[in-house]
Amino acid sequence: MKALRMVIRREWHRMTSRRLYLGVCVVLPLLCLFFMATIFGNGQMENIPVGIVDLDNTATSRNISRRISAAPTFRVTEHFTDEADARRALQQKDIYGYLVIPPRFEQKAVTGTGATLTYYYHYALLSVGSELMAAFENTLAPVALSPIVMQAEALGVSGEQIQTFLLPVEASTHPLYNPDMDYSIYLSQPFFFVLFQILILLTTVYSIGSELKFGSAGEWLEMARGNILTAVAGKLLPYTLIFSSIGILANYVLFGPLHIPFAGSLWLMNAVTVLFIIATQALAVFIYSVFPKIAYIISVVSMVGSLGATLSGVTFPVTAMYAPVHAASYLFPVRHFTEAAQAMIYFDAGFAYFWQSVATLFIFLLAALLILPLLKWWIKKEIREEAISASPSPCPPTALSTASVIRHEWHAIATNPAILLVLAGGIFLYGLLYNYMYAPNLVRKAPVAVVDLSHSALSREYIRLLYATPQTAVYGQTPNILEARQWMKQGDVAGILY
């Protein structure tokens, strides 16, 4: 216990003597928290710049333009006289979409001779494109039905009969757990911890690697009385306390001033957060123990942190990725923390619903403990090499030519797997891996539950259509809506058709 306290005091002195640690351990995480707390604004995509190409210039076309201007999603910034100018503005990102009202639109709409409204949107930006597509459809839907409504009213048909005729089956959509479709509710919390885990990985690797890099590993191990567990625990404990304090502060900020809905136990959320931080440190210890070269491993853990951001399942569902990528996602602590946190945030789930994720986080600690003897072997090897290099050489050093230095460095690069990994990963393989992760491109076979209380031919036809849709897969049918909600709470289904 005395050795542990001595290692902790030594590490605390190292931390307070260099401003680098203050910046990485305190300032950067707080900046990330401030950034994620403010980046999404009110949580809605509003006032997206769009344009209108009105080639009809009639009362009907002007009414459509007013509808577009009144929609909160749109901000009409330009009116164009031809489509070429609108397309050029879209390519330059001056606007993100535009509506084309063709010539003689009003005449065709009144006579029912195939009036068409065409809208274009920038779908390379997926979130913006999806928002614009939904907004265009919702805003222009009444316009598409207006000719039929006008003719029916002229024939004396009541408004209720028109509504029944146009929409015999009305869909009622209920976005559960985020009814306002608020981006901040869904993204602020996981994105902060995704950034946070990268800082934890880098700090942990640097704090251990600097001992070997600057030749103080022998002193560090000697102060721990040769016990590598005491040495690593004493070194990382100050960082664990600082990171845990920031993680708990982030939870209070996200679920307090930001008003992210959370009805679960904040104590349990804080406990899982601390466990996630320790598991991330354990992953960093494991990676560094495999190949303790700080210059290369810092690049490797940066890649690991970036991959964890994708494989956490926040930006694209991991279940929709290829099977090898899906399996690899479980090698990242942030994946399991995200699953546990989302179960508590969205479903108000108890520990029984995410105990597997918590148990997996403990496995990272076990892996780090098992590899500590290898880290100790590397440290002792470094100490022996330093002792040999410090002994006086009987032969005076010979001057090396420039060609000899170049050959030596080239041989080091060609024979060092860590350097090759960093170069290949950063330049080529890393990009291929990201393309492979997003290769499915579309979410397919998303599991849904069906609650059919009608048992009619029409309801069975709807279910057959659901089976035939490539984006969905019917997980099960039940007459009990509460059972379907339970499936969703357990993460077995992503939606319910009632």
Residue ranges and their predicted role:
Residues 1-184, 391-498:
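Extracytoplasmic/periplasmic domains immediately adjacent to an N-terminal transmembrane anchor
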Residues 3, 21, 25, 235, ...:
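Residue-level signature of transmembrane alpha-helical entry/exit and packing/kink sites
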Residues 36, 57, 88, 241, ...:
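Membrane-spanning alpha-helical segments of multipass transporters and channels
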Residues 127-144, 177-192, 211-222, 243-251, ...:
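Hydrophobic alpha-helical transmembrane segments
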